């Protein structure tokens, strides 16, 4: 398992064959453009954990990724 801190609250967790991105917020940019994600997890709605502009773009670039979000984030990703 490899855990990479991408800035502020954002981390990329990689295991054998799985890539999970956690809290892609607007205080970090290293996650923008990531592809081949298996899942995206957002813990809550604050912009430093869920970038309202770039998160939808990330999900478009990873159409097969499972998305797990706290209920207040649904409007951002829907």
Regions found by a protein language model. Name each.
Residues 1-35, 39:
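Conserved beta-strand hairpin/beta-sheet module of binuclear metal-dependent hydrolase folds
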Residues 26-73:
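Active-site metal-binding motif and surrounding structural segment of the metallo-beta-lactamase
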